[in-house]
């Protein structure tokens, strides 16, 4: 077990890729390839959600070439993003982000650290590594033409009627939530006057609708109003956003990867809110002089010629993107032994972690890490790497304890696993 601490997260990010499984491997709801869909589609109703499930036949979708061309033009004119592969250091933060991309059900990541340590740059660079998804053209919810759990109401009605859906391929959205955003801007608004006079539910979608099947990033989340944080975390956990005004209720899909960042010197999040983030990454200022020089020089190169700088890292970016895509495909095949599950729960119990979220997140993160490394079996080493990030923010604060919570988690891990 002594080898666990001898392996840095950077070695994980550069591990060899494995070949993709059969071409029929399923992908998660964030990744679909361009294709025509036809034939029978059958979805079974679920408890308390039957109105969002449909059963139809002979539904076909076709790629809209005009919309596709517009997307390509907008992509080329977009502001260049710093390459993820070019970010120096901060391996813990990068690993947490990658694991959430592989398995969005981990529950997002909270990144806390000093000012100017690359938190926002790293998060925004993540969008380049994500595959394109198929969405219904003109739909404000980025509806998935094949999954009713990710469909808006209008799209579901079209599917039920057997109408064709015009679809396009687009990059996954990275939605920024500003600190000054109101609840109506985040959740959406209902036009009460139109509802009363015309008898229709006039709904103006908010940021949660735009973030569906994408990433919602909240910078300085520790300064955001508590009630907005509650709304975000509830939507992220349930996958749905419900807006209720004057007796009118509207729900729409809101499945997104929630990423928050902040500086602990400016304020802490409530423990109840911290617990809702799947993982927690701590980012520190680089102290090595040579490494600091390298970071400054790389940033200067990017600022002077972003296009040329991005081309330098294009091959590494493509390799990492393929590795992520393969890991997402293989995730469902990754197994974790019962003995490891018991030991994980024992660590959580002995650390007096409230609830069971910690247990579930560790299991998911360890499986995602194994998939990233190209394996179908979780090892104790995988658990040892991810467990500090999964439990650090869930421990009860002791004002007399000066030791980092992550170290306490690691010590307990060795005690249980050896």
UniProtKB/Swiss-Prot annotation:
GO terms for biological process: chlorophyll biosynthetic process; photosynthesis. GO terms for cellular component: chloroplast; chloroplast stroma; magnesium chelatase complex; plastid. Its EC number is 6.6.1.1. It catalyses: protoporphyrin IX + Mg(2+) + ATP + H2O = Mg-protoporphyrin IX + ADP + phosphate + 3 H(+). ATP binds at residues 113-120. SMART domains: AAA. Keywords: Acetylation, ATP-binding, Chlorophyll biosynthesis, Chloroplast, Disulfide bond, Ligase, Nucleotide-binding, Photosynthesis, Plastid, Transit peptide. The magnesium chelatase complex is a heterotrimer consisting of subunits CHLI, CHLD and CHLH. Belongs to the Mg-chelatase subunits D/I family. This is Magnesium-chelatase subunit ChlI-2, chloroplastic. It comes from Arabidopsis thaliana.
